[in-house]
Every structure is written in C-alpha cells, then in structure tokens.
Amino acid sequence: MIHTQERGTEAWWMETGAEEWADAIVAAMKLGGVDNLFFVSGSELSFYQEAIAKAQTKGRPAPHLVTMTHEHVALNAALGNAMVRNQPAATAVHVDVGTLHYGAAIHTAWRGGYPVLMMAGTGPRAFPGSMRGARGGGVQWVQEPRDQGEIVRQYTKLDHRLEHQDNPGLMISRLL
C-alpha cells in the first residue's frame, strides 16, 4: 500500500510561502510525501538547488536534495527509495538526453507501480533579452526536442509540461 497524504482540498500546498515557481514546486513535493529528490544537475535545473537551499534557510518544507551523477542511477535510486520507504520519491534530470538516460528504469517504475515523480528540465522559450530567464546561449536552441514527454508517455500515468499560465504547486500536487 502506497502512503498518500489525505487533504480536504488541492490547495494544501499553499500553506507555505513561495516567491518563485521553484519554491511552490519543492514545497508541493514535500507536502505530497516526497522526502528525497534524486537530482542530476543541468543548466536548466539550478532552480531546484536554489529553492531547496532557500526553503532550508527559511524553515519551509522541501525534500532532501540527493545529487546523482547519472539519470539512470537517479531513477533507480528513486525506485529503491519508493519501494523501501513506501512513499513517493522524485527525480530531476537534464533536458532531452537526460530523459533518454532514464532508460529501462522507466519500464520498471511503470510495471511495478512505484510512485516516482519524474521531472526533466526544459530550455527557456522566451526570446533572448525579452524577459528574465529568456534563452541565452546557443545550446538552449539545440537541446530541446519537439515533445520531450513523448519519450516517457507510454510508461507514465500522466505527463505535463509546466507553462507560464500553470500554478506549479497545484500541478505538482495533482501529479503526486
């Protein structure tokens, strides 16, 4: 039996402060039962590190950041964590190739029914110089697949790409 958080409404993640999207994402993960985020760093993922450090400083809920060296190892660690602890775990990996590196562990997660939130980075979509966080370097133009979710879609209950109009805390709480 998988441990789930019982809540009266989906807005329970709003019990904590959030100045940035990342603050809401890490709070929603922790409040949804995720104690560990198995993390493979990438240029588009530094916000996880910043948000978790900020949460720890301000006494807000956030999962423990477990730095990993490879995406396949990260997903397998999350699977083991979910199996042993009987609660959800999460991974965050580099855009495109990082998602591909999850490999056959995606099949294991799906067929075993293990509660793992798999997140991948994405390049900025705003034109360079148009706003904070807009595209900058050339690599951001070539590492973005047309549909990154397609890589894992057959082996997941749900996939969602956060867009500017989304409420990130609400989306993470729904995904969990």
Task: Name each model feature, range by range.
Residues 2-176:
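N-terminal alpha/beta PP-like core and its mobile active-site loop of ThDP/TPP-dependent enzymes
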